[in-house]
A protein has these predicted regions:
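Catalytic phosphate/metal-binding cores of nucleic-acid and nucleotide-processing enzymes, i.e., regions
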Residues: 2-113
């Protein structure tokens, strides 16, 4: 047509966000099967707090924070700083790319699956 069509969101960004959203959902489903686990997704975007990890959980009395990335994804500087502050306060904080990463993190902290 005579008017160019420009996507509002670049396709690569949409695909990445979809994958990360699917990973977050899969991780939450996994966590909700664990005894003594309370987990929730934090809300990013315009109304969320920048740098806060995607998933927060209390597992058997231990605080966990998981920043979910697609495989090959990288943390922003603010996310790195936030995970470091959580660790400094005694919490467990991880960047994860799969349900298996979450299981490994919980095991590394001495938790049971």
């Amino acid at each position: 047509g005579k008017y160019p069509v420009t996507p509002v969101f670049p396709a690569h960004r949409f695909c990445r966000d979809m994958l990360e959203r699917e990973l977050v959902a899969a991780i939450l489903r996994h966590l909700k099967t664990m005894p003594r686990c309370f987990a929730w997704k934090t809300h990013g975007g315009m109304y969320g707090t920048a740098g806060i990890p995607d998933i927060i959980a209390c597992i058997d009395g231990r605080f966990y924070a998981f920043e979910v990335k697609q495989p090959g994804g990288r943390l922003t500087r603010l996310q790195e700083v936030t995970l470091g502050k959580i660790r400094a306060a005694g919490g467990a904080a991880y960047m994860v790319t799969s349900v298996e990463d979450v299981s490994a993190a919980i095991s590394a902290e001495g938790g049971s699956l």
